[in-house]
Amino acid sequence: MKLTVDLGPNSYPIHIENGILAKTGELVSEVFSGKKIMIVSDDNVFPLYGEIITKTLSDSGFECHSFVLPHGEPTKSFQSLPKIYEALLNAKLTRSDLLIALGGGVIGDLAGFAASSYLRGIKFVQIPTSLLAQVDSSVGGKVAVDLPQGKNLVGAFYHPKAVIIDPDVLNTLPDHFISDGMGEVIKYGCIKDKELFELLCRHTSFDDLKPKLTQIIARCVDIKRIVVEADQFDFGERILLNFGHTLAHTIEQHFHYERESHGEAVGIGMYQITKIAEEKGLTTSGCAEQIKKALEIYKLPDNSNLPIDVLTAAISLDKKNLNNHLNVVLLHDIGNSYVYPTDVSFFDGAGIV
């Protein structure tokens, strides 16, 4: 399956197919006519897929280099950037060369930001290997690194030349990372697709859902494609993709990215903000309970056991907080979301979340 993100001169294809990694060289040749390629990956992913990617690229006539970083959220830091730049310089990559981000969301965001800033920008291709990256972070052109004060505080809008999604790579993912990705899949159903949400709730586990996985990945990517085409720079409808993220980012930060994964934190954020919105009469009653049921099916938590006042200081630094005005994403109902302008006082009295 091939989708196209239509952004004029920044348009790019998204390829979704089982076993497509073996065609990487052919697909890269369609969007890149240079010679050198740097594969940036991590020490979990590269041992699994580095060889097949390097072979297919070499067979297509490319000169391949690789740089492998430690896995995990702490790698997505400002301190990792000089290491990538040094590897690019040592391999003598120029502005006419290409970087491939081979990994999950951390590698995609970090390597994408390195590509956006090295020599004022070189081409890059996303090959996401986690469910979360396949359905969300690899598409849309947001690249970033974290700072101690919060997630994604230094970044850019920088689109890849292509995204190559192989659902087969998910067979090597531990259950924890599958649940992580399902947090974002549930989000898409909540904000834009009631049918998708109901499909998720009709199944009893991820294993039960697996035969429909390629279809579900494609549906999530298509929703994101439509939203990004309408709002490339996050000023309007694209904000809807942040459903659950206001609380999620602060929960992740509070625990130094060592307890809840991103998808788990998004699950907590979606449920808790919907519960608050229902109490304020801003969301149809019963939505929070439906979200909780979906989270239970896919082994995701619904609370962090933190007092809200512990989180509100970090919320004030959130990117969605502009001039002390906070845009939170709420649901009218499942599948129908909207942006609600408020401020940090929205969370007053929420108690333990």
Give residue ranges: language-model regions.
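C-terminal charged capping/lid subdomain of soluble metabolic enzymes
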Residues: 183-185, 282-353
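Short glycine/serine/threonine-rich phosphate/pyrophosphate-binding segments
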Residues: 106-113, 134-135, 250
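Active-site segments that bind and position negatively charged phosphate/pyrophosphate groups
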Residues: 198-309
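Residue-level signal for inorganic ion chemistry
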Residues: 17, 39, 77, 128, ...
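ATP/NTP phosphate-donor binding region
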Residues: 1-97
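Non-catalytic interfacial helical region
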Residues: 85-102, 111-126
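A glycine/threonine-rich phosphate-anchoring loop and its flanking beta-alpha core
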Residues: 15, 113-205
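Hydrophobic/aromatic beta-strand patches that form the interior of the parallel beta-sheet core
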Residues: 65-67, 100, 125-127, 162-165, ...
